[in-house]
């Protein structure tokens, strides 16, 4: 079949026009036509020219009269080439050569009727998402919508979005899989080049080299190379030479402490926590903070003491029970109500009562937990420093139920007026009554009393005066441990009574402050007793006299009012041996006591 072609110049001009139209953005105005019916069946009035926005972007004005002329001269765009000729021939050529591709610019004089678009949409996308049908055949009566679907590479807006999403998802999955595969990169042993099982001793290594290095650093490792210390260590020959294998372990960086911080075992973390707890407790004790939850010393601390005393292993309740059992019995005085009081008679009654109480005090001290673990020198030293304080706190405790009076014995109850018969006794009486009133106001319990009494015994000689002529304590550390134990027992009693932490702190401070007043009263009483001795008002008994002389040796030289003569070494040795002999002589076995307890 032959076709008539146009000139070359006109063909090139039309080609440029078509290329320009294809490159224009698809933002053409919508198809302008009068709406005579609902969408889907739209009729064009033949009397009015109408503007069509064709898919390729070219706008044409036509009416029914000009349709035939336009159809006769419409150019045809084909896939195999560009040809220009009459409309009928061009339509036949275009249909035969393009197949399913749409025919452009073929116009019919008959009215245009748009039908519902098929499910397959146009490959040409409208800017506003409208679906525009495309036309293939030149029919004399009307334009028909081709039912054949568009090519596979053309899709609607929604289909494109779904397809793009699926493509992005699949590409991201492929990238993620590639990253995971690269993360799971196979690692090899730095020693023998076998597959590594993990990070061991600072390097990536297999199980065999890890176990070999562990055995080598923990046990016998004096290996000898049978060759020149240059053996090849690989997967197959790693067991041939232990010396070269160990050498290579060190060369690649294996070390005993080479453990990753995030792979520390439970045992190592447990040891680290124990170390931190011990350091924290030491810092806490150094700063003087009060113990909170755990009142007892740590076993790690007790282990380093000079003596592992059984008293340090007692619980709070066991300590209280032991102190209550050790309490001495009540002692009756030789008071005769038929005889009036005088200075000599009252001092004789009081000194005789004190001398007998000293005997029971020695027996009580030996039963205090921790006191019997001390050597004889320290036991004598503590008793010589605290004997009058112990007698006074016992007197104050017995007098709590008798306001304004002092109960020296069950048959000897004295008030302030009766104490005036002894020179200088009223001041000491007033201090004793004030302390008894303080105990009564605080509602002191018997368990707290025995703890305070033991604290007085153990704390009296710890801080020896620099001017003292006797040597100080030899086992101060052990004494401090026992003191801490008794103090913790006192706190336990307060917590057991239901006191809050703040109330416990306040009550403990108040009780310890009372001990300082008792120390002051003891010093006043010692001065008064020494003055009575110097005036020969009353004879002193042997044990009481020894205690008084020993106290003068422990006290500063200026305390007694008159400067004492410096004792000789013979006097010091005699006093020390006499006191020690007195402690052993006046010791009463517990089974020999037949008197009721004071508590």
From Swiss-Prot:
Main location: nucleus
GO CC terms: cytoplasm; euchromatin; Golgi apparatus; nucleus; plasma membrane; transcription regulator complex
Compositionally biased residues, Basic and acidic residues: 158-169
Modified residue annotations for Asymmetric dimethylarginine: 264
Cited function: Nuclear hormone receptor. The steroid hormones and their receptors are involved in the regulation of eukaryotic gene expression and affect cellular proliferation and differentiation in target tissues. Ligand-dependent nuclear transactivation involves either direct homodimer binding to a palindromic estrogen response element (ERE) sequence or association with other DNA-binding transcription factors, such as AP-1/c-Jun, c-Fos, ATF-2, Sp1 and Sp3, to mediate ERE-independent signaling.
Zinc finger (NR C4-type): 189-209, 225-249
Consequence the record notes for mutating residue 515 to A: Reduces DNA-binding, attenuates transcriptional activity, does not effect estrogen-dependent NF-kappa B transcriptional repression
Substitution effect: residue 591 to Q: In strain: SJL/J
Lineage of source species: Eukaryota, Metazoa, Chordata, Craniata, Vertebrata
Post-translational modification: Phosphorylated by cyclin A/CDK2 and CK1. Phosphorylation probably enhances transcriptional activity. Dephosphorylation at Ser-122 by PPP5C inhibits its transactivation activity. Phosphorylated by LMTK3 (in vitro).
Lipidation feature positions (S-palmitoyl cysteine): 451
Regions of compositional bias (Low complexity) in chain numbering: 568-581
Outcome when changing residue 515 to E: Abolishes DNA-binding, abolishes transcriptional activity and estrogen-dependent NF-kappa B transcriptional repression
Protein name: Estrogen receptor
Keyword Magnesium: no
């Amino acid at each position: 079949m032959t076709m008539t072609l146009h000139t070359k110049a006109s063909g090139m001009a039309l080609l440029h026009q078509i290329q320009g139209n294809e490159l224009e953005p698809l933002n053409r105005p919508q198809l302008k036509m009068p709406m005579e019916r609902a969408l889907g069946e739209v009729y064009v009035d033949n009397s009015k020219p109408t503007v069509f926005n064709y898919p390729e972007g070219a706008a044409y004005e036509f009416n029914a009269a000009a349709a035939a002329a336009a159809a006769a001269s419409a150019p045809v765009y084909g896939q195999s080439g560009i040809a220009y000729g009459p409309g009928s021939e061009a339509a036949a050529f275009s249909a035969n050569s393009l197949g399913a591709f749409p025919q452009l610019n073929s116009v019919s004089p008959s009215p245009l009727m748009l039908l519902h678009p098929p499910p397959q949409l146009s490959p040409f996308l409208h800017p506003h998402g409208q679906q525009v049908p495309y036309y293939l055949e030149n029919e004399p009566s009307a334009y028909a919508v081709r039912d054949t679907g568009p090519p596979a590479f053309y899709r609607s807006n929604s289909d494109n979005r779904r397809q793009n999403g699926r493509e992005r998802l699949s590409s991201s999955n492929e990238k993620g899989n590639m990253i995971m595969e690269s993360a799971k990169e196979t690692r090899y042993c730095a020693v023998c080049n076998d597959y590594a099982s993990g990070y061991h001793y600072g390097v990536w290594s297999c199980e065999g080299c890890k176990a070999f290095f562990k055995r080598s650093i923990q046990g016998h490792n004096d290996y000898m190379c049978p060759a020149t210390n240059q053996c090849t260590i690989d997967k197959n020959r790693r067991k041939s030479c232990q010396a070269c294998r160990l050498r290579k372990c060190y060369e690649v960086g294996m070390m005993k402490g080479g453990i990753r911080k995030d792979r520390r075992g439970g045992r190592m973390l447990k040891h680290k926590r124990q170390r931190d707890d011990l350091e924290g407790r030491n810092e806490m004790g150094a700063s003087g903070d009060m113990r909170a939850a755990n009142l007892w010393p740590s076993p790690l601390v007790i282990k380093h003491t000079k003596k592992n005393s059984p008293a340090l292993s007692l619980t709070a309740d066991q300590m209280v029970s032991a102190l209550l059992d050790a309490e001495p019995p009540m002692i009756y005085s030789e008071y005769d109500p038929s005889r009036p009081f005088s200075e000599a008679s009252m001092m004789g009654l009081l000194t005789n009562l004190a001398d007998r109480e000293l005997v029971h005090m020695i027996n009580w001290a030996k039963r205090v937990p921790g006191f019997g673990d001390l050597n004889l020198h320290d036991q004598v030293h503590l008793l010589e420093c605290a004997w009058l304080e112990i007698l006074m706190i016992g007197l104050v405790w017995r007098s709590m139920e008798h306001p304004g009076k002092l109960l020296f014995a069950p048959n000897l109850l004295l008030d302030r007026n009766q104490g005036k018969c002894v020179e200088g006794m009223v001041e000491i009486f007033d201090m004793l009554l004030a302390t008894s009133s303080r105990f009564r106001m605080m509602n002191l319990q018997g368990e707290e009393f025995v703890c305070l009494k033991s604290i007085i015994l153990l704390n009296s000689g710890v801080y020896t005066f620099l001017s003292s002529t006797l040597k100080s304590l030899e086992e101060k550390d052990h004494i401090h441990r026992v003191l801490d134990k008794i103090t913790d027992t006192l706190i336990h009693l307060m917590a057991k009574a239901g006191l809050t932490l703040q109330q416990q702190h306040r009550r403990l401070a108040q009780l310890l402050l009372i001990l300082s007043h008792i120390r002051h009263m003891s010093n006043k009483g010692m001065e008064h007793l020494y003055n009575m001795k110097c005036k020969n008002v009353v004879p002193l008994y042997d044990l009481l006299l020894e205690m008084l002389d020993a106290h003068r040796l422990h006290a500063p030289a200026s305390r007694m009012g008159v400067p004492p003569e410096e004792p000789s070494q013979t006097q010091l040795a005699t006093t020390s041996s006499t006191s020690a002999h007195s402690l052993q002589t006046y010791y009463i076995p517990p089974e020999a006591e037949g008197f009721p307890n004071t508590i």
